[in-house]
């Protein structure tokens, strides 16, 4: 955490040393900032939770992590975004959760109209609830890695303006965005004499649609949703190995403010993966995400700009 914080602070300090010459370019629909580095600090509430529905016995069980809030730091330049988060103990949602942790890392890149995301969730310390009863399980760990590959059909629609804001939507537009999602999840339970491991792999494909509403020159409201279908393969979650149909859904709502150098907003998103782990048991794998953020843009070093321009020219991007 200390190293990442120092890097972000260094970027902000260097930004004040650079001249404030306007480096943005515009067209009718999108304002871009090709020669700017965007830095952002955010307060995030997120987790990877699991709900088990035992249809045969009409029972419902929830497994939710103790730690759900963290501070996030982001750095964006051209097509690359890197996010890092950590969970301070002094947050109300994280208090009294000794031996619990949440580590979250997100990477997003844009290559032309293609968008690639990579998500990582490493969690320790859950509580198990059923029939209004709650039990703390400090020995439960989960590790999830995966992401999505998407294609943005409408060149006049800016996905980068939704929360990430190294672009800005200057005229309302929407786009069809087909996506393929894939996640690998590993579970580890240690409790007294119990030491059990399980895993799950998800892959699904489906359509998405997003629309950016330009309320004023500086304010944006965005809505979007994705629905898909695919396959899940689980090992040792239910009755040994089990393969079933996977249904996935995601939704996003964003409110953003933007100026040449300063930006801020609220970014909300949810991902739901539903599948069976045996013939009569359904598992819902959910990742809710709520973020409040502020950010600042400054001029990128000339060497970075030249390197990016040379790369784009070489590969025709």
Language model: regions and residue ranges:
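Transmembrane beta-strands of outer-membrane beta-barrel pores
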Residues: 43-49, 77-81, 86-92, 111-113, ...
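Surface-exposed strand-loop-strand hairpins of Gram-negative outer-membrane beta-barrel proteins
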Residues: 46-70, 81, 85-96
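Bacterial Sec-dependent N-terminal signal peptides
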Residues: 1-29, 219-221, 294, 298, ...
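Outer-membrane pore/translocation modules
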Residues: 26, 102-200, 269, 311, ...
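Residues on the lipid-exposed face of transmembrane beta-strands in outer-membrane beta-barrel proteins
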Residues: 41, 71-77, 105-109, 147-153, ...
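Outer-envelope beta-barrel architecture signal
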Residues: 33-39, 69, 78-80, 112-116, ...
